[in-house]
Amino acid sequence: MTDSNNQSPNKKTSGSSGAPTAADGRQENRRSRGEKRGGRRDRRGQERDSEWQERVVQIRRVSKTVKGGKKMSFRAIVVVGNEKGQVGVGVGKAGDVIGAVRKGVADGKKHLVRVPLTRNSSIPTLSNGRDGAASVLIRPAAPGTGVIAGGSIRTVLELAGIKNVLAKRLGSKTPLNNARAAMVALSELRTHKATAKERGISLEQIYS
């Protein structure tokens, strides 16, 4: 007689079947929904990043004197803009060029300036900016004129979306000072409507 208490090793206990349960299905649904949401966020982030353009104005090798001697690094001046009225200038330092440029881009996006543009992709009024020993004068121009500027000033104006403008550099020729002076000039621009409101007059009086 065989012992009825002995069970065959091939027998599976109840509840250990390989069939998926309702809880497993719910977990898979949650996971798929999370992946979809994450995918949409990634696409939105990529679209935002694709709007911005980056141009390196200058890369220099700099040194810092420390206790053990001189520490060499790279400094990158980067202009960031979307050609739709937003532009920024950033500076980044790192031990390699790629790291310096990456930091410069991040710094530029932290110091963005909104530029009021006219229908002709120009600026509404004349403006002057100064940084250190550099001074920049920018004035509106007629359609078809183009960007009459040079160096880092031209880069700032182009990435801001300005297509018709005249610019004159005075004083220092340093790329960083000129770029920052151009940023100061752009930050002081106001639309005709805002100017009329500040002065307490009508738009007709502004144009007259």
From Swiss-Prot:
NCBIfam families associated with the record: rpsE_bact (TIGR01021)
Source taxon at top rank: Bacteria
Region named Disordered: 1-54
Family: Belongs to the universal ribosomal protein uS5 family.
Listed Gene3D superfamilies: 3.30.160.20, 3.30.230.10
Cellular component terms per the entry's GO annotation: small ribosomal subunit
Gene Ontology biological-process entries: translation
Gene coding for it: rpsE
PROSITE patterns reported in the protein's UniProt record: RIBOSOMAL_S5, S5_DSRBD
Keyword annotations of the record: Ribonucleoprotein, Ribosomal protein, RNA-binding, rRNA-binding
Job description of the protein: With S4 and S12 plays an important role in translational accuracy. Located at the back of the 30S subunit body where it stabilizes the conformation of the head with respect to the body.
Ranges of biased composition (kind: Basic and acidic residues): 25-37, 44-54
Compositional bias per record (Polar residues), positions renumbered to this chain: 1-19
Pfam family, one: Ribosomal_S5_C
Domain remarks in the Swiss-Prot or TrEMBL record: The N-terminal domain interacts with the head of the 30S subunit; the C-terminal domain interacts with the body and contacts protein S4. The interaction surface between S4 and S5 is involved in control of translational fidelity.
SUBUNIT field: Part of the 30S ribosomal subunit. Contacts proteins S4 and S8.
Protein name: Small ribosomal subunit protein uS5
Domain S5 DRBM residue range list: 52-115
Sample GO molecular function, one term: rRNA binding
